[in-house]
Amino acid sequence: MFLKNQNIHFVGIGGSGMSGIAEVLINLGHRVSGSDLKKTDVTEYLKAVGAKIYIGHSCKNIKSAEVVVTSTAISRNNPEVVAALKKRIPIIARIEMLVELARLKYAVTITGTHGKTTTTSLTSLVLHNGGLDPTIVIGGRLKNLKTNAKLGRGDYIVVEADESDGSFLRLSPIITVVTNIDNDHLDYYDSMENLKEAFVKHINCIPFYGTAIICSDNEVVRKIIPQITRRYITYGLMGNPDIKASNIKVLKNHTSFDVFYMRKKVGSVCMKILGKHNVSNSLAAIGVGLRLGISFSSIADTINKFDGVSRRLEIKGEKNGMMVIDDYGHHPTEVAATLRAIKLFWPERRLVVLFQPHRYTRTKQLFNEFGRSFSDADFVKVLDIYSAGEQPIDEVTSDLILESLVSNKCKAEKFSDLEEFSKGLSVGDVVLTLGAGDVWKKGEELLALI
């Protein structure tokens, strides 16, 4: 790896993709600083583990930096980026730093449009509890380890690999998981064909001794199989995949299922996390664990004790007979899976959703699909679009989604005021805050109100 004790500065250090890398670098002995627009639990945590944190962006923040790390959300007009250019300080994308961290390890990458964070978390914990002591970089907080990153002494690094801007193609894994491929990030790829081609390239870059572990339930994944030139293992809930979950039982406080590997039953799992989509995510982690020689009993014990990931079907609290759940889902497929999981666990309770659309481009491309994805919701309140750094697009507002919901016979209204919203709630209601922006704050505020 590069020279020790570097002064490394992150612009937007509180971001989910940046904070984990920063923490690993701190644990490697580097001096890490970073800036963000506001103080958050993440920036406070990084401060506690040794990072120098600046609130707000300023050219003064990089005075000691030897390299500046940015994400795609950071503009080239950012004052810290401008100052770094003037001072001839190298400016690199977060993926370049991640590649550097992974260079001297055997990388396990978790890719796919949906389910990456949970699958990365499950896989990381399977390797951790299986005695492999991996380095871990995840896009969400793994509750069992109380962090989204860990520096391990073992040979492996488990990475949540982001396909949104094609940057996952720079990683060179020995094992890669593909959870699914769906119509997202087409503002970058232009077409589904280009998106599929990127996944094929990522899979085929693994060495001849590596393995791709792919979800055959997903139609697009099945379509790319003829183009795969490396060893692969399939997993899923349908058909005859190499790793299959059968006898799935969704009960009040757990989901149980039997696991078959190469048509033979290897054991059973009884997990605490909600949703059949998480059964699928568990199968991916099982596949990685078995491929690396971890016993099924160890893998199953890890999955059974898995507490989940922050902002993924996370129960925030229950008060006066009403429950508040938060989820990061921001694509129609994710929305539908999340609502279905909640309804399976609490079919008798009214499900009320506070939905915050994420990005103007996604809203423009998928508003019709969003309108069809809320069929399991009893009532939906739609917030304004969370821009995630994008510039507004003419005539693209959350009203597009609202109108699509109404046309699909979903009871939906525009959100205006939380106190007014709380007055319409009843004992037994489940309130879901849904979206990749800051809608989770509404849930915390609501718990204080009711």
UniProtKB/Swiss-Prot annotation:
One of its GO terms (biological process) is cell division. SUPFAM superfamilies: MurCD N-terminal domain (SSF51984), MurD-like peptide ligases, catalytic domain (SSF53623), MurD-like peptide ligases, peptide-binding domain (SSF53244). Pfam families: Mur_ligase, Mur_ligase_C, Mur_ligase_M. GO terms for molecular function: ATP binding; UDP-N-acetylmuramate-L-alanine ligase activity. Pathway: Cell wall biogenesis; peptidoglycan biosynthesis. Gene3D superfamilies: Mur ligase, C-terminal domain, Mur-like, catalytic domain, NAD(P)-binding Rossmann-like Domain. ATP binds at G112, T113, H114, G115, K116, T117, T118. It comes from the Bacteria. The keyword Cytoplasm applies. Its main location: cytoplasm. GO terms for cellular component: cytoplasm. It is found in: Cytoplasm. The keyword Cell division applies. It is an enzyme of class 6 (ligase). Keywords: ATP-binding, Cell cycle, Cell division, Cell shape, Cell wall biogenesis/degradation, Cytoplasm, Ligase, Nucleotide-binding, Peptidoglycan synthesis. It catalyses: UDP-N-acetyl-alpha-D-muramate + L-alanine + ATP = UDP-N-acetyl-alpha-D-muramoyl-L-alanine + ADP + phosphate + H(+). InterPro entries: Mur-like_cat_sf, Mur_ligase_C, Mur_ligase_C_dom_sf, Mur_ligase_cen, Mur_ligase_N, MurCDEF_pg_biosynth, UDP-N-AcMur_Ala_ligase_MurC. Its EC number is 6.3.2.8. PANTHER family: UDP-N-ACETYLMURAMATE--L-ALANINE LIGASE, UDP-N-ACETYLMURAMATE--L-ALANINE LIGASE-RELATED. Belongs to the MurCDEF family. Cell wall formation. This is UDP-N-acetylmuramate--L-alanine ligase. The lineage of its organism: Bacteria, Pseudomonadati, Elusimicrobiota, Endomicrobiia, Endomicrobiales. The gene is murC.
